[in-house]
């Protein structure tokens, strides 16, 4: 992909943010899935951090994938993508200075946008996996990320966890990220429209929601009315691919069908239970 075409895809993404429509992001995890999503006329795709960890490392979402590994996968996708790609940049792979490097590398990889979250990652000793960093530290990361980008069309989206915060705290964080210059606000943990409508009217930036297919938020027109421009309904395509691979290999091996769900397969083959034991035993981490 040329620099010019990268710039064009970033402009396309900004047009989505500036529209009055809510778009359903395709979960992409490799070049083939990105090409399929583009052929099916999805307006935007997302490379999730959890999916990247599964695809690249066969590991759970424990902040194990490195920046280099994530960027390599984003670069592979960027070479063939004909739709804007959002990169889930987790916590920026460190502090504000690390986040600057993350932005630089992902910009070169060709992504149209990236999300930076305020979760305390990797989890610290004795902390919960959902703990957040202090607000001033999170604001510093957003400011640093904006400073690091070269193409002004690259969108920097600040992400927070509404499930861990009160409505007032969520609004406060989102407003602070807006004031720092974030191009959009991404929220996870919105329970339903009542929850969303208590927050959205207080914000000016375009919104992105990660809903994991929550049926209580399954109304694209109503999402759009509340300023939501991008919705991520989870990574069903990836899980379906894992399930199909498992079932086909079982059939080829002659061992018959399995009752294991896609989620159960990902837990099993990412050895998630083993990592949970390690986290409890060595770090006193509580999920």
Swiss-Prot record:
Binding partners and assembly: Homotetramer; dimer of dimers.
Transmembrane segments: none
Residues binding Mg(2+), per UniProt: 88
HAMAP family noted in UniProt: OadC (MF_01299)
Enzymatic reactions: oxaloacetate + H(+) = pyruvate + CO2
One Gene Ontology molecular-function label: oxaloacetate decarboxylase activity
Cofactor needs: Mg(2+)
Gene3D superfamilies noted in UniProt: Phosphoenolpyruvate-binding domains (3.20.20.60)
Cysteines paired by S-S bonds: none
InterPro entries, sorted: ICL/PEPM, Oxaloacetate_deCOase_bac, Pyrv/PenolPyrv_kinase-like_dom, Pyrv_kinase-like_dom_sf
GO biological process: oxaloacetate metabolic process; propionate catabolic process, 2-methylcitrate cycle; pyruvate biosynthetic process
Protein name: Oxaloacetate decarboxylase
Family: Belongs to the isocitrate lyase family. Oxaloacetate decarboxylase subfamily.
Note on cofactor: Binds 1 Mg(2+) ion per subunit.
Top-rank EC class of the record's enzyme: lyase
